[in-house]
Amino acid sequence: MKYAWIDKQREFPLTEVCAILDVSVSGYRSWQRGGRPNRKRLTDIQMLALIQSIHAELKGIYGSPRMVRELRDRGFPASKERVERLMRENDIRARHKRRYKVTTDSKHNLPIAPNLLDRNFNPAAPNQVWTSDITYLWTDEGWLYLAIVLDLFNREIVGWSLKPRMTTDIVTDALTMAWFRKRPAAGLMHHSDRGSQYASHAFQRALEKYGMICSMSRKGNCWDNAPTESWFNSFKNERVHGLRYETRAEMTAMSFEYIEVLYNRKRQHSSLGYKSPIRFLDDWLITQQKEKLVA
């Protein structure tokens, strides 16, 4: 009996064991309860209270499609129509996105790399293509600049850096964090815009040191780095616009919480089948392991 065997494997993560045996976690939980259902159907008042609680907890980042999946993940299945109705009737909405603004300076005489990525935003495996960009964040103490490195495979932020000035250090620090975290093999493609920070000799030396291939967007074409710019739009929409940060330390703490706690590990991503980046990667790795065992 698969469920009885799973019950003995306490040293391994439950989700991984269930995935290897092709059974659902919910099915295993039901077996533990003797086949009894987990919860009765919630009333509209109870469901609304739960939706409002999640909306407040996640600071309004989810519309109805993601809310349906979040409820399901928490053990409260509900139809898309029901969640849409409750959110509409009670004016519960996701925060609206704003247009992206360019922050890097591409007016320089430094060498420019060709656009090798060419908008191929769906690599077949992790650590094949990383993309980078910089954005600005205002606090009462002054500006902060955030540089990120994003793995296109699972949209995970693998490296990031916050500094009060937009110098070359900000992008090299983000790249260094990403490299030490993932240790990718030589040949990884790194894509960015033509900003002077990315074209600088220091950053190009860092790429060469890590065995990475440089790719840059075409002049004035934001769509060549669309996934990274989209991430900044979501980040600012969900954590910056309409909010006040008194100190740089407060902004830094918020950025850490958003990237490392919420986005990478919890936030559903529509292009990943409404999984978080790390969950998507974990599921992919489990699938790879199963295929190796079969082979």
What are these regions (language model features)?
Residues 1-295:
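Charged DNA-binding/catalytic regions of mobile-element recombinases
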